[in-house]
Amino acid sequence: MARPGRLGVGIIGAGKVGAVLGAALRAAEHAVVGVSAVSEASRERAETLLPGVPVLEIQDIVERAELVVLAVPDDALGELVEGLAKLGAWQPGQLVAHTSGRYGVGILQPVRAAGAIPLALHPAMTFTGMSLDLTRLLDCTFGVTADAAMLPIAQALVVEMGAEPVAIAEADRTIYHAALAHASNHMVTLVAQASQLLREIGVELPESMLGPLLRATLENALASGESALTGPVARGDVGTVSAHAQALKEYDAGAGGDVLEAYQAMAKATARRAGNRGLLRQEQLNDINEALDSGSQPHNGLSSSEGN
């Protein structure tokens, strides 16, 4: 016997996110009535994660579904929603949820105008597009935006997929998405740069060296926040910071690299936060910034760690 409140779900976009969320909703006993898949990879993904679900045209999916999940790139979302509105595809009372981190429900105004219910359900995790993502959803948080009266519906859908909903105000969606992108996307760049440096000096498996350090650092940062801050910048060790900056300047000059710029930006941000926490005096902060900009020793020639 089917559970009450089960929906006919249509998935628009069988990319890594859409196919997995469709499978999660199906596991919660919702009926996936159709999926759109353009590329060969997306068709194969749909066949693997949503076996037996018909691959349909987008308008046919919207016509059949009580819940439409729009799992498409941010830049395509607005045009898709407006195009379907012009075709008269949206139905009164229909639930329409997009998975974009950047947008709230404002971009779904054509949906609202047709009497359908707009929801924004963004999973804060990276996806492989494979079944292992279904297990990872159990540790995932969704950024959820909806009208106040509809927020419980959005939250319930997330809980049914095994994840944790967190309400994000419409006005805060861009900051929310920027925070996640800054933490996740830029970490990949940071690891790539550090691995490149180690590989250049002969470390055969830089990932093996960095892995334990990065995992411990991440765990400490999540558990303790800025109290977990360590290293030469937080200690005011200007000599070491200066040596780092000079070495990276020389490395970038020879390799055409971009490491120094990233190191400078993050070290300056770290120094400001260390100063705000009282770990650095203003003079130390100035010397750190001078060392980062010039790669030279501070004007007094002393390591600012003295007196710490």
Language-model features, listed with the residues they occupy:
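NAD(P)+-binding Rossmann beta1-loop-alpha1 motif at the extreme N-terminus of oxidoreductases
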Residues: 1-63
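Rossmann-like NAD(P)(H) cofactor-binding subdomain of soluble oxidoreductases
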Residues: 40, 44, 54-132
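Interdomain hinge/lid region at the active-site interface
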Residues: 218-284
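Short phosphate-binding/catalytic loops that engage adenosine nucleotides
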Residues: 30-31, 116, 163, 203
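Short, hydrophobic beta-strand segments that form beta-sheet elements in well-ordered domains
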Residues: 33-37, 96-99, 144
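Internal alpha-helical scaffold of NAD(P)-dependent oxidoreductase catalytic cores
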Residues: 45-49, 111, 132-223, 252-254, ...
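NAD(P)-dependent dehydrogenase/reductase Rossmann-like domain
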Residues: 272-308
